[in-house]
Amino acid sequence: MKLDYARYSERFGALTINSVQHVHELDSGNAEYHRSRTVAQISERELYDMYNRLAVVVPVKNERLKLLEGVISGIPHDCLVIVVSSSSRNPVDRYKLERDTLKHHVLLTDRDVILVHQKDPELAHVFEALNYPYILDGRMVRDGKGEGMLIGLLIAKMMGKEYIGFIDSDNYIPGAVNEYVKIYAAGMLISESPYTMVRIAWRYKPKVAQGGLYFAKWGRISEYTNRYLNMLISSHTGFETDVVKTGNAGEHAMSMRLAELLDYSSSFAIEPYELVYMMEEFGGVLESRHADAMYE
C-alpha cells in the first residue's frame, strides 16, 4: 500500500490532528521501493503482521443478514472478528439468525469470530462484578451503539489484541470493508506514537436521490459535527481550521493503549466524543489524568 504521510496537522496541546492522508495504491506490488519523504509504502508482510494484532468490532442491530455476512467476509482472515448484537429476540429471534449465519461462515472459512448479545444477562453480571454500573440499565446493559462498542473493546483486550477497529454493519460493499482494515493497519504502522487513532473519510457511500445515486461529500450530520469540532479547535488555537473531516466516523481504529485511556459516551455520541475527550484530556484545557502519555 502507498499512502501519504501527514502533510498538514493541527496541534491542540499534546494532541496532533492530521489532515486527510490519501491512499494512492491499495496494492503497491513487489517492486523495490525507495521511500520518499511524502509517501509511505507498506508491504503485504507488514500488513499481515498487523492483522494478527488487530480485532475488528462490528456492532449490529436488526441488520439484513446478507449485509452482515458481506461485512464479515470483507475483514482479512487473520483479524479477530467480534460481533456485538443488539438485535431483537422476538417475535423473530434475529440474534439466532445472526448466530446461524456466522456459524456457517466460520465452518466455511475456519476463522475466529466472537459473537455476543448486548442484552445477555451474563454480561451485566460481569460489569456488576467489575463495579462498572454506568453501562447498566437495571440488571441489563443499556441499548446503544457506544455500549456495544465498549463491550467489543473489552473482549478485544481480554483476547490480548494490541489494536482495535470498528466497522458499521450497514456497509453494502465487502471490498470497501477490506480497504478499511488495510487503512487501519497502515495508519498504525506509520504512526510514531503508541497512542494512535485512525479515522476513515470514505466518500463512496451513495444515497438514492431523484431516482439515481448521489455521492455526497459529507453526510448531513457529519457536516455539522465537523464544523463545530473545527470551531472548537479554532477557538483554542486562534486560527481558523477545517482539519477535522471525520467527526462522526463509524469506521475508525485505535491502539489499545489509547483505548485504555479514553472515556466513552453512550449511544451514537461515541465517535465525536472520542475527539472531544482527547482535546480535553491531552489538549492542556484541563489537568490531565494521563500526563505520561502526553510525552509520547
Residue ranges and their predicted role:
Residues 1-74:
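N-proximal low-complexity "stem/linker" segments adjacent to membrane-targeting elements
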Residues 46-49, 70-81, 100-108:
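Short, acidic, metal-binding catalytic loop of nucleotide-sugar glycosyltransferases
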Residues 146, 247, 256, 268-276:
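Conserved glycosyltransferase catalytic-site signature
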Residues 161-174:
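Short beta-strand-to-loop acidic/aromatic patch adjacent to the donor-nucleotide binding site
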